[in-house]
Amino acid sequence: MATWSNFNLQNSASPLMEQIIFFHDHTLIILIMITILVGYLMISLFFNSYINRFLLEGQMIELIWTILPTITLIFIALPSLRLLYLLDELNNPLITLKSIGHQWYWSYEYSDFQNIQFDSYMIPINEMKNNNFRLLDVDNRIILPMNNQIRILVTATDVIHSWTIPSLGVKVDANPGRLNQTNFFINRPGIFYGQCSEICGANHSFMPIVIESISIKNFINWINNYS
């Protein structure tokens, strides 16, 4: 989750989020180089006294300012396209989780198992314990096994919501009457927080999402105990 005084992205908990962070850093380096170059040129123009009153055209400079931006865009577009294809790729998921957005809570169904479904509400401030996070903790967490491919189906019953876990690099719109899907792979145990990322009404800020990542053995025990 996000921490105090942290200006970076959240620590990744999935290979997909790692790739998103790499792309962010790659793009940021290019933007910094462009900013420095443009700043240097502007300062040079302000403080030098050179002038060319007879310059009518400059084909070479026009060629340069056409080719350089094109090359820059290619360097940004190629890794971006690769990442977009990775986002849509489904690799034989072990578990399918269905997430349904409501005003203003989430409900979940484990489609591969019988009778495992529950609602997930934010814990009110007056019921919080000392180790809870304000506006982030819920009464029923999503339990998922780590090091396994997970598919999630997202929909809504009333208005548009958005199911988002930043540390996993996952953000899916929940549209009424439509199923959207994506997949993710959690590569470490832990508790990961997210929130609804689409303004959905008065209590939009009170729709947190919590995933608890555990080993496959503990996940099987949880399934057996829940059933």
From Swiss-Prot:
Segments crossing the lipid bilayer: 27-51, 63-81
Q: Which SUPFAM superfamilies match?
A: Cupredoxins, Cytochrome c oxidase subunit II-like, transmembrane region
Q: Where does Mg(2+) bind?
A: 198
> Per the record, GO CC terms?
mitochondrial inner membrane
Q: How does it assemble?
A: Component of the cytochrome c oxidase (complex IV, CIV), a multisubunit enzyme composed of a catalytic core of 3 subunits and several supernumerary subunits. The complex exists as a monomer or a dimer and forms supercomplexes (SCs) in the inner mitochondrial membrane with ubiquinol-cytochrome c oxidoreductase (cytochrome b-c1 complex, complex III, CIII).
Q: Which PANTHER family match?
A: CYTOCHROME C OXIDASE SUBUNIT 2, CYTOCHROME C OXIDASE, SUBUNIT II
Question: What protein name applies here?
Answer: Cytochrome c oxidase subunit 2
Q: Which organism is it from?
A: Choristoneura occidentalis biennis (Two-year-cycle budworm moth)
